[in-house]
Swiss-Prot record:
Active site: 10
Role played: Has an important function as a repair enzyme for proteins that have been inactivated by oxidation. Catalyzes the reversible oxidation-reduction of methionine sulfoxide in proteins to methionine.
Keyword DNA-binding set for record: no
SUPFAM superfamilies from the UniProt entry: Peptide methionine sulfoxide reductase
UniProt protein name: Peptide methionine sulfoxide reductase MsrA
EC number: 1.8.4.11
GO molecular function, one term: peptide-methionine (S)-S-oxide reductase activity
Gene3D superfamilies with a match to the protein in the record: Peptide methionine sulphoxide reductase MsrA
Catalytic activity: L-methionyl-[protein] + [thioredoxin]-disulfide + H2O = L-methionyl-(S)-S-oxide-[protein] + [thioredoxin]-dithiol; [thioredoxin]-disulfide + L-methionine + H2O = L-methionine (S)-S-oxide + [thioredoxin]-dithiol
Organism classification: Bacteria, Bacillati, Bacillota, Bacilli, Lactobacillales
Superkingdom assignment: Bacteria
Protein family according to the UniProt entry: Belongs to the MsrA Met sulfoxide reductase family.
Amino acid sequence: MERAIFAGGCFWCMVQPFEELDGIESVLSGYTGGHVENPTYKEVCSKTTGHTEAVEIIFNPEKISYADLVELYWAQTDPTDAFGQFEDRGDNYRPVIFYENEEQRQIAQKSKDKLQASGRFDRPIVTSIEPADTFYPAEDYHQAFYRTNPARYALSSARRHAFLEENWH
């Protein structure tokens, strides 16, 4: 098994697209990239921890490639917005591909360059590609939020879904 960590705004919206794929062992919502150990949701939302909401994906590379996961990642985000995603603003919601090793870094960078060259967006692709750090799982009530709180999930993801429909589908 291998690990991928992606930040694309609110972690609630980043679970379902990956969780439903063959070859995915688990998808956890959590926090990474900051300087506070074992942060809470409240602490991360205070924007004082340096952490970003993210998902940790454990996958079987014999069934799905890291490159495939990166391609799906792009289609869940607005890669031209460095200051958050959709309804969620600030560094704790910034888009980041966190890489585990040089191979993942190269795959992510090549994919980002390809997206920039495609002309799909008229603004620069600003999603960061950064080395992975400790991943701290979020509190239980955040896990698989789309299943446990479908009405709240639908409300919180409306702008995201409209953007994705217009720009990716």
